[in-house]
Each structure stands twice: as C-alpha cells, then as structure tokens.
Amino acid sequence: MSLSISVVLFDVDGTIVDSAPAVMSAFRGALSDYDLPIPDGQRLRTYVGPPLWYSFGDLGYEGELLANLVNGYRARYHAHFLDPKPFPGVIDLLHELHDAGVPLATATSKQAPMALAQMSHLGLSTVFDVIAGATPDPASCKATVIHEALTRLADRGADVSRPVIVGDSIWDVRGAKEAGIPVI
C-alpha cells in the first residue's frame, strides 16, 4: 500500500509552536509605540497567523504608519521568537513522518530566516527537507510560500504530486486553496 500523500507542509505559528503570546505581545508593543488603541484579547488573537501587512491594515492603518507598525512588530518579535514552545506531540509526529521517509517542509508567514532559526532551536532543522517562509515583501502570501516549498522539494527530488499542508488558521486554508492543494 502506498501513501496517498507524497509530501507534507506545515505551518509554524499555531501549528508547530504556540506563538500566540509572543505574537500578541509584539503586536501590542508596536501599537503602543504610536499610542494607538490596542484591540481586546479576542480580536488580537485573530492576528496570530495572518501576514502582518494584513493584520495592521485590518485595523485601518496604511502607508508609512503601516510600514512602521510592521517594522516595530518585527523588532519586538525578533527578541522573543525563540520563546514559543511546541505543542504536545508535534515533535514526535514530525520525527515519525521524517523517519517514515515522508518529505517535509514548512510553509509559514513567518520570515524564512526566523523560521530556520526557530526550527534549528527546536532541533527540527534536519527533520524538514525544506524550510520555507515569507519574505519582507508585502506581496508575500501563504500561497507563494506554499509554491516555493513545493518547488524546492521538487528540486530535491521529492514527488510533489500529492501534497497537503497542515495548518491552524483560515490563512492556511485560503493559501492552500489558492495554491491548489488540500489542507488539514
């Protein structure tokens, strides 16, 4: 019997690690830097996962202020991005898939260098065949990261004809739909 899935992509924030506290803290800090109102915890939690440009834009910010908020968030988050812990069982699952020969990749809205550093910090850099993440470009979206991950896996010889992404948010679902792959 062969696997019906040829490669598995994983979102990082909210799927591999519980990054909500660090994300929300950086978000609050960026808004506080400009004395801007801070959304309540429930609304703030909806900004864990989406691209930063969307999240701050959703609050009505644009132009130079939007860019400053994104940069302020990144500076604050960079100081704590290694703090989030993996969800229970995730590390074992990733090792089991890797040991079974399933090609694995990240496909995260987190910037690629941070994703690599975080996977290295968790001891997972050798479990993933590809660590793909967003670029600083506001046009970088989940679907482009998914396509990059699949292209890089294919370049390494993986069969990418039956991919799936594992994620936790509507952004993962939308990105998968746009990229034309199933999502769990």
State where each predicted segment sits.
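Glycine-rich phosphate-binding loop signature in dinucleotide/nucleotide-binding domains
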Residues: 2-3, 99-102, 152-160
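Active-site neighborhood of HAD-like aspartate-dependent phosphohydrolases
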Residues: 2-46
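Conserved donor sugar-nucleotide recognition element shared by glycan-biosynthetic enzymes
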Residues: 23, 48, 86, 142
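Substrate-recognition element of Asp-dependent hydrolases with the DxDx(T/V) motif
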Residues: 27, 90-119, 132-134
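Helix-loop "lid/cap" segments that line or gate small-molecule binding pockets
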Residues: 30, 50-64, 118, 149-153
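Metal-dependent phosphoesterase signature
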Residues: 57-95
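Substrate-recognition "cap/lid" segment bordering the active-site pocket of phosphatases
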Residues: 83, 113-164, 170-179
